[in-house]
Amino acid sequence: MKKITFLTICLSLFLVGGLFSQQTVYVSATGAGSKDGTSEANAYGNFSFALVDINSAEDKLIVIGTVTVGAATIWNKNFAFTIEGKDATSTITGNGGASRLFTLNQSTTIDVTFKDLTFSNYNSNLAGGAVLLSNNAGATVTFDNCIFTDNSISNGAGGGAILFANGNLTITGTTFKSNTSTDEGGAIMGLSGTITITNSVFESNSAATKGGAIYSSSANFTITGSTFYDNATTGIGNSDGGAAFNVAGAGSTNSITNCTFYQNTTARANQDYGTIRTDNGNTTVSNSLFYGNKMDNDTAGPSDWGSGPNGTQTFETSIAQWISINIDNQDEGTGSITGIKGGAGTPANLTSSNLTFNLATGKVEYVAVDSTEDSPIDFGSDGNDVGAWNSGLTLSLEKEDFLATKISVYYNSASKNLEVLHSISEPISLEVYTILGTKVLSLNNINARQLINVNHLNTGIYILVGKTPEKFFSKKFLIN
C-alpha cells in the first residue's frame, strides 16, 4: 500500500508539473487541424479559447493572421506571459461598440508583453482606452514592436488606444497612427503610474480637447528617441491644446529626450497651446527638435511649447521656433537659439534642409546643405550644436537607414588614417565637414576599403557625409 501511495504521489506531481510548464499556444482567424492550439497546423480558431491555455509563467500565445476579438479576459493571470504575432500580418482587430479588447481593473500582479502585433479598428464607446484600459497598481504591461492604427474612443474618458492608471507601462519601437479620442489623448491617456516610451512614432493621432497624441493627468512619462508627426487637437475651448503632448496634473513628472516634433497642429489660435502644453507638473525637454508646428488649423504659428505659470519646465539644448515665456529654465546651448522664448529673437530656420517625414521609416529626414546654412546637425556658429548632433536624434539623411547598415568608419590615432569600409554596389563619394559645417575633404568613387590620411585635420568632432546617385548617409567621428 505504501509503495502504491508513493507512486501515486510521484505520478500526480509529474502530471501537475507538466500541466503548468511553459507552453506555446497558437490562434488564427478560423483555426486549423484539430484546433487545440498545440501548433500552427492545429491553431485555435477562437482567441478566448486560446487564452484559457495561457495558465503559467512564460507561456506564449502566437497570433496568426488577422483575428477578430470583441473583449478578452487576461486580468486573472497573475504571472508573466506574452502575446506575440507570428509575422508582420499578425493583427488583432475589433468589432466596435460597447467593448474594449483588454480591461485590467481588478487587483492583479499581471505582467503581460505584447510583441510584433497590430491592433486596429477598435472603436469603443466605453469609458476610455479602446485597446487597453489598465487601472491596477500591480500591473506591468509592455508593447514591443507593435502598431496601433485607427482605434478610437467616443466616451469622454479619453485614450483612443490606451488609458493607463497606476502600474508600469513600457512602449518600445511601436507606432501609433490615426487613433482618435472625442476628449483627451488621441493615442494614450495617462492618469497615473509610470509610462516609458522609447523609439516610437506618433503619427496623425487626434483628440478633440487635449493631447492629440498623449495626455498626462498625473502619470510620469519618460519619452526618448521618438517622433511626433501630424498630430492634432481639434477643439477651440479655453484649455484645449497640446497637439503632441499635454500635461495637466501637478503630480506629473516628465522627461522628453532626443525627440522630433514636426508639423503638428492645434485648432486654437492661441500660441500658448501648441505642440506641447503644460499646465502643471515638472517637464524637461532636451536634445530635441521642434519644427513646422502650427496653430489655428495650420494657418498660423509657430507654436512649439506653450505653458501656464504653474509647475517647472526646462528646455535645454534643443531646436525650436517658439516657446512660452512661462518656461522656467531655458538653456539652448551657447550661441544657438537664444531668444525664441516668447517669440523674441530669431527662430530656427531649416528651410534649406528640406525636412520631410518618411512614411516608411517613421523618421524626419533632411538633405545636406551648404556650410553657410543651418541644418538639424549644424545649428549656430559656436560649434556647440543642439538637437540632432548632441543627442543622436531621430533624424536621418535620405535613405540613411539603408546605407548605415552597409558602411563603417574607424579612426586610427596611431597612423592618423580614417578607414572606411562599405559593401555598397553603387559609386559612392565622401565629404568630411567640421562641426561648423566647413568642408575639409572630398573623395569620389571610394574603394570597398578606403584609407584616408587625415593627419592635416585638427582634433575634434567631424561629420562624414556619403553620397550615392540616389541616397545619402551621415556618420560622426572623433579625431583625438
Regions found by a protein language model. Name each.
Residues 58-81, 87-90:
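N-terminal extracellular ligand-recognition/capping segment immediately after the signal peptide
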Residues 71-78, 113, 133-134, 140-145, ...:
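Predominantly extracellular beta-rich ligand-binding scaffolds that present long acidic/polar faces
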Residues 79-124, 350:
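Right-handed parallel beta-helix/beta-spiral solenoid domain characteristic of secreted/periplasmic
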Residues 400-480:
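C-terminal outer-membrane/trafficking sorting elements
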Residues 362-396:
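Surface beta-loop-beta hairpin patches that serve as ligand-binding interfaces in beta-rich domains
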Residues 26, 62, 429-433:
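Beta-strand signatures of extracellular beta-sandwich domains
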Residues 30-62, 370-378, 412, 440:
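Acidic Gly/Asp/Thr-rich repetitive segments characteristic of extracellular carbohydrate-active
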Residues 1-23, 397, 451, 466, ...:
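Bacterial Sec-dependent N-terminal signal peptides
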